């Protein structure tokens, strides 16, 4: 039931909310790591862009050694927080970080595969959160496939509109 948590004892509710918060922080740190990696990979191309050239990494405002150190600390922190929750969550988190890093390195250059990859990233985030909830309450509960599919199709819809808008705007300029 959707409102199953209302009937739980207070210590289980606190455990659930704590695990959800830890998972949230873990995914935030993982996403932050990926953004840094992506900016680092794109730094040379961003230097020539009128807006992106002002980014700290593209404009060389941050030394490369510091970028590497901070990104390593963020990645280790993300995985460390994930380890607190459950093995199934850390598995999802590692797949997410790996696939989004692969996106930054290769996939973003492949038409349509790039938006599918981003949509899968959103699905992994939702699935990771659902895994935390299930593991905190009752491991016999199954995560709804509809939750994952609706997230995937909704993100594909939004990403397709964004892509169409980018293509249309590029043709106008």
Where are these regions (language model features)?
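Multi-pass membrane catalytic core of lipid/isoprenoid biosynthesis enzymes
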Residues: 43, 48-93, 141-152, 156
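Interhelical loop and helix-boundary elements at the membrane-water interface
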Residues: 53-67, 102-120, 164-173
């Amino acid at each position: 039931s959707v409102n199953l948590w209302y009937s739980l004892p207070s210590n289980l509710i606190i455990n659930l909310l704590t695990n959800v918060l830890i998972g949230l922080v873990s995914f935030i740190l993982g996403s932050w790591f990926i953004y840094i990696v992506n900016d680092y990979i794109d730094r040379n191309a961003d230097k020539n862009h009128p807006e992106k050239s002002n980014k700290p990494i593209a404009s060389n405002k941050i030394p490369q050694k510091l970028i590497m150190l901070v990104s390593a600390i963020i990645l280790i922190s993300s995985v460390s927080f994930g380890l607190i929750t459950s093995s199934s969550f850390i598995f999802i988190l590692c797949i997410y970080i790996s696939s989004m890093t692969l996106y930054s390195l290769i996939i973003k250059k492949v038409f349509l595969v790039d938006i599918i990859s981003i949509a899968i990233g959103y699905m992994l985030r939702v699935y990771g959160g659902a895994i935390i909830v299930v593991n905190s309450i009752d491991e016999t509960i199954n995560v709804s496939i509809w939750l994952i599919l609706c997230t995937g199709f909704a993100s594909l819809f939004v990403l397709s509109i964004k892509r169409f808008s980018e293509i249309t705007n590029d043709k106008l300029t």
